[in-house]
A protein has these predicted regions:
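Ferredoxin-like alpha/beta domains used as RNA- or RNAP-binding modules
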Residues: 1-102, 129-207
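Mid-length scaffold segments of soluble, non-membrane domains
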Residues: 101-104, 108-120
Length: 207
């Protein structure tokens, strides 16, 4: 899947490459926001800085505002004292992200297509819901026909990120299987993220 042009503009606006969007290089030629020139970045207000942290999560994991708020509500219900870490864990364990992190796809949008087209198995059963949250010890694998898919081959040959330590790969009956061996947390978000600013953004808002 080609990286959409607006994904590059999004990353330039943030001054940060978001791995989930796929191909690197968004900042290599023009490391400044669209509409600006030179290397001086505009100074932002405290509110804008807090908003930016929220945008990083929403854009990297390709979520609508409504979807992100639902994940926040679920995280606050499960672990109210440490809900941001719980949120990070849930986002990292979304099926589309796990497929991407395993190197089965070169980006989260590409992984989402594999999931929605029924190419992904969880514990041997087809799951076609990208927002499905994978549990610890569950196995993720590809259907046989998916191994010939160009998106899969691209991801396997040149993964965007190294395999995180909460995942492992095994060869099972001649197939590559990914396993969630531990619960991820804030430290596994694959880009600089200020949890404090993010928390402040939602402190006065009802998710």
């Amino acid at each position: 899947m080609a990286v959409k042009r607006h994904y590059f503009k999004t990353q330039r606006r943030l001054g940060l490459e978001l791995p989930g969007l796929g191909k690197s290089g968004a900042l290599s030629r023009r490391p400044y926001p669209p509409g600006e020139s030179g290397n001086k970045r505009k100074k932002y207000s405290d509110y804008a800085l807090r908003l930016e942290e929220k945008q990083k999560l929403r854009l990297n994991y390709i979520l609508t505002e409504r979807q992100l708020r639902r994940f926040i509500r679920d995280s606050k219900t499960g672990q109210p004292a440490n809900w941001v870490n719980s949120l990070a864990s849930r986002l990292e364990r979304r099926l589309d992200n796990v497929v991407f992190r395993l190197g089965f796809a070169p980006s989260i949008p590409a992984a989402r297509q594999l999931v929605s087209h029924g190419h992904i198995l969880v514990d041997g059963k087809k799951v076609d819901i990208s927002s499905f949250v994978v549990k610890k010890d569950q196995e993720i694998s590809l259907k046989d026909k998916a191994l010939k898919n160009q998106t899969v081959l691209q991801g396997l040959q040149k993964p965007r990120l190294d395999l995180p330590d909460y995942l492992r790969k095994e060869d099972k009956d001649g197939k590559v299987v990914g396993i969630v061996q531990a619960l991820p947390g804030l430290e596994h978000i694959p880009f600089p993220f200020d949890a404090g600013l993010f928390t402040e953004y939602y402190a006065a808002r009802k998710a």
